[in-house]
Swiss-Prot record:
NCBIfam families: L12 (TIGR00855). It comes from Thalassiosira pseudonana. The gene is rpl12. SUPFAM superfamilies: ClpS-like, Ribosomal protein L7/12, oligomerisation (N-terminal) domain. One of its GO terms (cellular component) is chloroplast. Forms part of the ribosomal stalk which helps the ribosome interact with GTP-bound translation factors. Is thus essential for accurate translation. One of its GO terms (molecular function) is structural constituent of ribosome. The keyword Plastid applies. This is Large ribosomal subunit protein bL12c. It is found in: Plastid, Chloroplast. Residues 103-128 are annotated as: Disordered.
Amino acid sequence: MSEKINQIVEELKTLTLLEASELVAAIEETFGVDASASTGGGVVMAVAPAAAEEVEEKTEFTVMLDEVPADKKIAVLKVVRTLTGLGLKEAKELVESTPKMVQEGLGKDAAEDAKKQIEDAGGKVSLT
């Protein structure tokens, strides 16, 4: 924008509601336009709800085991076995080959609970 436009915008920001209303009336009279017939505001209102609808809360989560410190492998292994029902060998392979998916298709609460259990045991977890 030009400097002149920027100055006008800054000046408009300082107007009270009454002054802004008077300004609109003066512009309507001077230029022979009707601000109430403007469709610009309607378009903005129509777009805003559509954008809000696109932001849906995720309902299914995948628990990813990102990293396990060497001194925490046994504790994390026990938690992974409890969460997944895997055997000792399978759970050990999962823990030693991070990053790996631990569980998928979980609800938010279940995923948060699994994440907390693994983190409490010393593992680093992410939810996707």
